[in-house]
Amino acid sequence: LIGGGEVSIPDEIKEDVYDLGFLDIQDKYDACAGSVCLCQPSKNESFSIVIMESWLCERPVLVHKACNVTSNFAKESNSGLYFNDYFEFEGCVNYYVNNPDIAAAMGKTGRQFVLDNYKWDVIVKRFLDFFEV
């Protein structure tokens, strides 16, 4: 786990969960690049910067199906899986762990999705096209 704030880790999984707390930006990217995937379980995300950062690190994502924004990103980019309950979550994690080549390919696809859609020049062009400048 990465991020600020307190988290209560159940005793039965404490040995398997590492709470790194708040990290500086490079350590965050290094942790992301070395991970199996990034999990963004929120049901109430808008645009998720951390998902884009994960894809730039060539890692796939795992998001909650009830979050329209992040599950749409996962579907549109073909760079993530989504879950609705614990059993689907577990299945998705196992899929990534047992299929590292597919996970790596999904991460690369995610990186290209970010570069194709959210690089500064792409965003500026969208604004200019919108305003017909």
Language model features: what each stretch is:
Residues S8-Y29:
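Nucleotide-activated donor-binding/catalytic signature segment of Leloir-type glycosyltransferases, i.e.
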Residues Y29, F47, M52-L56, T70-N72:
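Short alpha-helical segment that forms part of, or immediately flanks, the ligand-binding pocket
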Residues P60-H64:
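Short hydrophobic beta-strand element within catalytic cores of glycosyltransferases
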Residues E76-F87, Y95-P100:
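Conserved acidic donor-binding segment of nucleotide-sugar-dependent glycosyltransferases
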Residues Y95, I102-D116, R126:
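A short, well-ordered alpha-helix in the C-terminal region of glycosyltransferases
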